[in-house]
Amino acid sequence: MSTLRYTLVVNGSVYGSQSARTAYQFASALIEKGHTLVSVFFYQDGVTNGTELTVPANDEFHLTKAWQQLAKQHNVRLETCVAAALRRGVVSQSEASQHGLLQHNLADGFEQAGLGSLAEAMLTQDRVVQF
């Protein structure tokens, strides 16, 4: 079996739909099958997966932490679209400084990137799958 290189695009919010959780399950399965997950690009409402201020109920799956653990264990880039993130209040430390904000809330392990990063992934990965 040949292994493939993947990038996932997640458009669904962290808890507003099943999209992000399904993407996480797909990511885990493809890694388990020996494929390489290069990056996950969070776009539109999907950028909410990258806020460190998400606090699910005690009996709920903590999706942001799950993404962080997956990224750390398997060297996966977690990228939030910077424009979509800023519109939705998900702000990195550098963006907070640039815009004169006192606080930032981008979770550890996530970075902010532009659409150029997604375009590059579409050109270089074997598969790009959108959720």
Swiss-Prot record:
GO terms for molecular function: sulfur carrier activity; sulfurtransferase activity. Disulfide bonds: none annotated. One of its GO terms (biological process) is tRNA wobble position uridine thiolation. The keyword Metal-binding does not apply. Signal peptide: none annotated. It is found in: Cytoplasm. Keywords: Cytoplasm, Transferase. It comes from the Bacteria. Belongs to the DsrE/TusD family. This is Sulfurtransferase TusD homolog. It comes from Vibrio vulnificus (strain CMCP6). The lineage of its organism: Bacteria, Pseudomonadati, Pseudomonadota, Gammaproteobacteria, Vibrionales. The gene is tusD.
